[in-house]
Amino acid sequence: MWPPCGAMRNLALVLARSQRARACSGNERVSYTQGQSPEPRTREYFYYVDHQGQLFLDDSKMKNFITCFKDLQFLVTFFSRLRPNHSGRYEASFPFLSLCGRERNFLRCEDRPVVFTHLLASDSESPRLSYCGGGEALAIPFEPARLLPLAANGRLYHPAPERAGGVGLVRSALAFELSACFEYGPNSPTVPSHVQWQGRRIALTMDLAPLLLAAPPP
């Protein structure tokens, strides 16, 4: 077990105990107790990520910047191990799972499990998008041509690691900054056709649309 796993477990236990480890129904469809042990030497915890990329214990009554997880090592460990939940437990309600030894960390999300929060500029490399509070440790190359503005909800999406669903949400503040680079055609006033980036006019591929629209709602 990596050192961060112990920190993850201990922090979750403290928070769960502070809430009296109550049984809860995070989305009105499933009951659980934070830190429950369905099998010997196995613990289960339940998390939620919002549209700003903030991670919380799922049963937290108050979800805001003060109550979200901020420890970098914890966030990197959690999100770098995120996978689709094929465990046979809570699959419908918590579609993603982060394993840490015998610790199961189930995740549900407001929109997508990966939320891009910052565009990291570099003099020597192409820009990278950082997600879910992980800084440089959780970052992928920025692909401006593959940005997907979705008119149905007014949100912006970008490719994400395949293990985390392949599509990530761009946080609203960052999406607003990037929207200044969009170019709209005369026949499409609501959906951009190109993006102006680093002196180039780049056509948007829209190739993420089938993958995003085919995904079940969280």
UniProtKB/Swiss-Prot annotation:
A UniProt-annotated Pfam family: DUF4505
Source organism superkingdom: Eukaryota
Family as reported in the entry's similarity comment: Belongs to the UPF0598 family.
Protein name per UniProt: UPF0598 protein C8orf82 homolog
Organism: Rattus norvegicus
Top-level taxonomy: Eukaryota, Metazoa, Chordata, Craniata, Vertebrata
